[in-house]
Amino acid sequence: MVAFKFLLALSLSLLVSAAIAQTREPRLTQGQQCRFQRISGAQPSLRIQSEGGTTELWDERQEQFQCAGIVAMRSTIRPNGLSLPNYHPSPRLVYIERGQGLISIMVPGCAETYQVHRSQRTMERTEASEQQDRGSVRDLHQKVHRLRQGDIVAIPSGAAHWCYNDGSEDLVAVSINDVNHLSNQLDQKFRAFYLAGGVPRSGEQEQQARQTFHNIFRAFDAELLSEAFNVPQETIRRMQSEEEERGLIVMARERMTFVRPDEEEGEQEHRGRQLDNGLEETFCTMKFRTNVESRREADIFSRQAGRVHVVDRNKLPILKYMDLSAEKGNLYSNALVSPDWSMTGHTIVYVTRGDAQVQVVDHNGQALMNDRVNQGEMFVVPQYYTSTARAGNNGFEWVAFKTTGSPMRSPLAGYTSVIRAMPLQVITNSYQISPNQAQALKMNRGSQSFLLSPGGRRS
């Protein structure tokens, strides 16, 4: 009995230690190649056409994406389209660029807390016995979340999920997968494990796509799975069929409806029971999404320059396990983002509207980027590299994914800048300028910080 208690205590100790270690060091330690001569805005290089939409991937072999340790993709789901259930070995952060829909992120061990009588749903039945018993059969499932334009969605590694477009327009979702995260112990090649579907055979890049997306049931022995699920082998053969002409996103036979909390209840943050390791929430009750469209809730706001929403581990606590964060920015016509550098991670920028002139400078003083970026393009700003941007005449909007749960930046101009924090004598001697010039360098942006109005006007 004593030995059993000792082993139990040791096991719990190791479990807690592992959890703490993952929270503190959630990223791989092997060196990444961030030695390149050029950064530029990139468009997706691989397009997979499915029955219910398209899946586009940026080239993960590009140096800028290898430096950041991420793989980026964009999914477009047609109305009544279903993105088939799948999981991946690395955490994913998603931005809903357009449309609305439903998503369920299924966490192992969490209760099936939602149920509905099948007679309440419109379903195609193929068995007479099902028609006879339809009033007594219930469908149990985990929580289904509403998606809207502007949502940031966190999907943990290994968590199976599906997405359905119940709206009247295309649902467009842009996401990054952090293949350099500690939870991914395979390698830095992106993989997606599908529970249904398969890659269509048409297309020049079929082979590359087939190496990335797999139906996990297809290679199993049908008799073994039949016994495991306790269902006929014909059912298993249907599960194993990749239905290659349908692809990764399919059209639902009829409009689907699900039991879910009402819209207001879905916005509340449910609290789990207090655990001995100090965590106040469990994965079963954590929020997976938050919205960044509200002007009133912007973290940074300037009447003459724009606004920025930040989504970090404080706003979305699940991000402390994923060590990712995001920001949504809106820069007015000809306004600037202060030159700055990220102290805690790489930044992956996706342009959602407008255009901007972007400059990125490395530690050698080389301009790795001095280009105009446009809607639909993506580029990487490596950690500690200094960058700035000026919006075009039509403004500039972006979403930035960051490989850290606690983003921290160090601006060079403005109220909270490094220059403003220096004594005048340090500035005058560093740049060989007069005290008046040093004072202007420190103070001419007034109370502005990060977002700077065009022409130096104060907001």
UniProtKB/Swiss-Prot annotation:
Cupin type-1 domain mapped to chain residues: 37-237, 290-439
Annotated S-S bridges: 34-67, 110-284
Tissue: Expressed in seeds (at protein level). Expressed in seeds.
GO biological process assignments: seed maturation
Residue segments, region Disordered: 118-139
Pfam family, one: Cupin_1
GO CC annotations on file: endosperm protein body
Signal peptide bounds: 1-21
Keyword Zinc-finger: no
Annotated GO MF terms: nutrient reservoir activity
InterPro entries membership: 11S_seedstore_CS, 11S_seedstore_pln, Cupin_1, RmlC-like_jellyroll, RmlC_Cupin_sf, Seed_Storage-Functional
Composition skew (Basic and acidic residues), residue ranges: 121-139
Family per similarity comment: Belongs to the 11S seed storage protein (globulins) family.
Protein name according to UniProt: 11S globulin seed storage protein 2
Organism listed in the record: Sesamum indicum (Oriental sesame)
